[in-house]
Amino acid sequence: MTPHINAKIGDFYPQCLLCGDPLRVSYIAKKFLQDAKEITNVRNMLGFSGKYKGKGISLMGHGMGIASCTIYVTELIKTYQVKELLRIGTCGAISPKVGLKDIIMATGASTDSKTNRVRFLNHDLSATPDFELSLRAYQTAKRLGIDLKVGNVFSSDFFYSFETHAFDLMAQYNHLAIEMEAAGLYATAMELNSKALCLCSVSDHLITKEALSPKERVESFDNMIILALEMMS
């Protein structure tokens, strides 16, 4: 056990899908996994283990933002020996290259958070995903006929009051969307010699002001869940 996860050692499989929302974790477990079992519930941050097409896989919530995400990622790696961590979440698009319902594979993550500078002795850390996981995601998307969008994301500490005047600059540097965790996830996995990747489904477009309905959000997220489970199976 850890201060934030009350699962037993051995409850987590080496591969784990991460979601910010613990209710989404429960949804995935009930809809997509066989023999799903709740293994942790501290602070109502739920975790499950089960089978997908006969292969063991775990699910874990991580809350919102880099600080919360890195707590869970650190404990999963150091205490529960999780080797591959795949975050699946939503994001707000800032580039004309992507639209609503698109799935983005974050090949790099910039951030306005200071956490990686503290971690890397005030130098700029290149927060990037594991290549092998990225390749598997790309190849699986091709097999499933999913037009996976590939590019950078910006992990912000702010959900509200973000610097909207910076959107054009970010898009110029091939940043496709804004989310809140990838930079911390990648840095933690790099530090602890584990594999991580972030996939994000576009739920809102911050430039065009388009947004998915609640029903559309579920449907588009299901496509990403299937992609994530297939690439891990």
Curated annotation (Swiss-Prot):
The active site is at D204 (proton donor). Phosphate binds at G20, R24, R43, R87, I88, G89, T90. GO terms for biological process: purine nucleoside catabolic process. Its EC number is 2.4.2.1. It catalyses: a purine D-ribonucleoside + phosphate = a purine nucleobase + alpha-D-ribose 1-phosphate; a purine 2'-deoxy-D-ribonucleoside + phosphate = a purine nucleobase + 2-deoxy-alpha-D-ribose 1-phosphate. Keywords: Glycosyltransferase, Transferase. One of its GO terms (molecular function) is purine-nucleoside phosphorylase activity. The record marks R217 as: Important for catalytic activity. It is an enzyme of class 2 (transferase). It comes from the Bacteria. Catalyzes the reversible phosphorolytic breakdown of the N-glycosidic bond in the beta-(deoxy)ribonucleoside molecules, with the formation of the corresponding free purine bases and pentose-1-phosphate. This is Purine nucleoside phosphorylase DeoD-type. The gene is deoD.
